Amino acid sequence: MSTIPSRRSFLRNLAGGAAFLPAAVATLGELRPLLAATVGAESRWELVRRQFAFSEAKVPINAANLCPSPRAVTEQVVHFTHDIDNDCSFNNRGKFKKLLEESRGKVAAGIGADPDEVALVRNTSEANNVINNGMPLSKGDEVVIWEQNHPTNNVAWDVRAARYGFTVKRVTVPQNPKSEQELVDAFESALTSRTRVLSITHVSNLSGIRLPAQAIGLVAQKRGIYYHVDGAQSWGAVAINVHEMGWDSYTASSHKWFCGPREVGLLYVKQNRIKELWPNVVAPDWGTAVDTALKGARKFESLGQRDDSRLAAMGTAADFHAMLGAPAIEARMYALVQPLKKGLQDAGAKLVTPMDEKVSGGVCIIEIPEEHRASMVNALYDKHGIAGATTGGLRLCPHLYNTMEHIERAVAGVKDLRKWLA
């Protein structure tokens, strides 16, 4: 029996007042007073949900891969795209340089960085490869990575090592860590006098484990080791201050938890580390000399012609997050994912992801035999209107646009399809 959506849930929302909330708005200026006037946490998040265009018939719970953007962000992309199509002259496009810098400043403020430390590249993959290819390494050097890193922060190091002769060492952590210190110890014990780089992932898309990235960074900092953090599963989901964290570099994608324009990525590099990294690409805006005319981390976004409309709309996405507040977004994520994990466990599923939120993030994975994963994900989508992924089993990653009713539907769907749990 389909659960898309039930009369019971409609009446529950009606009783709670959600049905009387204002509809979606096109600008953040319209949204701000509505949020301020909303009474009750669930009503506030219901209003946030209404800023996203997806239908209740097909609900995305896979933020680890791709998120929808709020209407205000989409409207900005469309507006500037039409603007360029109507007049693609240099004269008209001149304004995008200022808009890019405004976006950079807002993104930087959101992570506690200086604007000159932020490059807006195309995605996490490109940003990770800037670090991988830009770090001077040679025979005798060692790079330590987490075995659960994304390929662009994993096998990419092997490819580079095959060319330059350095070694790559992988760290394995327990499936259910007893504490954050156990995770710190796993990485600290892998470091040697030859280690030049320690490169980790903040939150794993394969297990949902959240590493204590600040504590691990302190270990690297004491040894003078370059410390890189892939934040594809944390930017836009958890509160980040890169200066307080002490990271040398941090990478992420706008299209995931940040809910921003697609094909824009974040690369943060600490000011005193920028000079030691070489760029991947040199394009016309680099200048005419080996020493670039570009200031700070901008040298890493010298990529040729870009989609100006998406870069301009990054500022709107940053404003959206700032309006809600990073701590509130993180709290909402946990308020959704923790009941999801418990509900799935109660339905008979075995969690891959730790239950303890100190060592887990917004990624929730349950065990599904590999031969049943596609069937489970397809049936959950077709019959129950819940979009997940087959990564590691069944992966569900709720975010700020999801409601408690979505969580209940996901749990009910897995319970209905429990024949594929084993």
Predicted feature residues:
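Pyridoxal 5′-phosphate
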Residues: 2-422
